[in-house]
């Protein structure tokens, strides 16, 4: 990655945590909002943009829930049709995993094998043995 390029993060899982991360990354503010219902969420005013927007950007999201995908599109977020498509995107530097906990291990392994950096919601894995296996 060139130092003049933005670090591109893609999010798998766009529920409560993933959508909050999407808002923070898309807005450039680094600020998140709590959303009880993802369809009610709105991106913050771009006038709030901080230096964060000069360093990183949201590459896109994917989710198995069509309503969450529709929300992302309505917010101007690129949507990947599958996790595999996201992993194949050479412009993506990192994957932020915000899926149910039992999926973290397999998704992290797949992302690492695809050459991506991994950010994972807590708990990072279901056990320390799983984490050691991933590392």
Locations of regions flagged by a protein language model:
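Beta-strand-loop-alpha-helix segment that lines the small-molecule cofactor/substrate pocket
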Residues: 94, 100-101, 105-135
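Conserved acidic residues
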Residues: 59, 77, 91-93
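Short, acidic/turn-prone active-site loops that include or flank metal/cofactor-
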Residues: 37-40, 84-86, 124-126
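N-terminal Rossmann-like dinucleotide-binding module
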Residues: 1-75
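Conserved SAM-binding strand-loop segment of SAM-dependent methyltransferases
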Residues: 77-85
């Amino acid at each position: 990655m060139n130092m003049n390029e933005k670090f591109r993060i893609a999010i798998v899982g766009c529920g409560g945590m993933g959508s909050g991360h999407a808002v923070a990354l898309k807005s450039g503010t680094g600020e998140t909002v709590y959303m009880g219902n993802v369809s009610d969420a709105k991106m913050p005013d771009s006038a709030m943009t901080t230096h964060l927007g000069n360093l990183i950007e949201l590459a896109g999201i994917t989710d198995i829930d069509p309503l969450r995908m529709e929300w992302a599109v309505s917010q101007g977020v690129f949507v990947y049709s599958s996790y595999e498509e996201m992993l194949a995107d050479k412009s993506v530097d990192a994957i932020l995993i915000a899926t149910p906990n039992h999926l973290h291990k397999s998704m992290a392994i797949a992302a690492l094998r695809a050459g991506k950096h991994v950010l994972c919601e807590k708990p990072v894995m279901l056990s320390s043995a799983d984490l050691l296996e991933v590392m």
